[in-house]
């Protein structure tokens, strides 16, 4: 049986309460704040010709993440919750490839969470909310592709989150 962040059980279909969805969305919102900060900082500190294109792309990503934060905040308010104000911790490095790798890992985790969030919204009958999250998911997948390309890697396959993963 899956267990929600607050310790109460989720049923096998992934149905959760509105309050639990608010908790999950607030965690997502904190992740969006983290992404904004990361992309703003990384876009300015990446140096050298090999990083010019990705640095410009990261600036664009920062704006998209702000848009995501606004959408998620609006959904939390719609559900009767209070949007979070704290970002998740931002990882930094002196090495450009490490910074890009941090972002790649964050995007993979974000995609996992948003896929789960779509299922949770639909299980509560919140189909419009699920559509908003699907739109965010498209951007996050594009970010993943950009980062993998900049790192010279194949785009990683994002696996479904495990039942015990802390979302």
Give the label of every model feature segment.
Residues 1-167:
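Iron-associated oxidoreductase/ferritin-like identity signal
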């Amino acid at each position: 049986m899956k267990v929600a962040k607050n310790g109460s059980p989720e049923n096998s279909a992934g149905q959760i309460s509105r309050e639990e969805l608010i908790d999950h969305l607030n965690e997502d919102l904190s992740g969006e704040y983290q992404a904004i900060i990361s992309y703003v900082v990384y876009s300015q500190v990446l140096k050298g010709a090999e990083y010019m294109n990705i640095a410009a792309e990261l600036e664009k990503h920062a704006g998209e993440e702000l848009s995501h934060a606004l959408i998620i905040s609006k959904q939390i308010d719609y559900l009767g919750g209070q949007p979070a104000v704290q970002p998740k911790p931002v990882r930094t490095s002196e090495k450009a490839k490490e910074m890009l790798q941090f972002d790649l890992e964050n995007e993979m985790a974000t995609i996992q969470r948003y896929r789960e969030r779509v299922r949770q919204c639909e299980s509560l009958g919140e189909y419009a909310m699920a559509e908003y999250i699907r739109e965010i998911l498209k951007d996050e997948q594009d970010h993943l592709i950009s980062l993998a390309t900049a790192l010279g890697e194949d785009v990683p396959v994002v696996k479904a989150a495990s039942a015990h993963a802390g979302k």
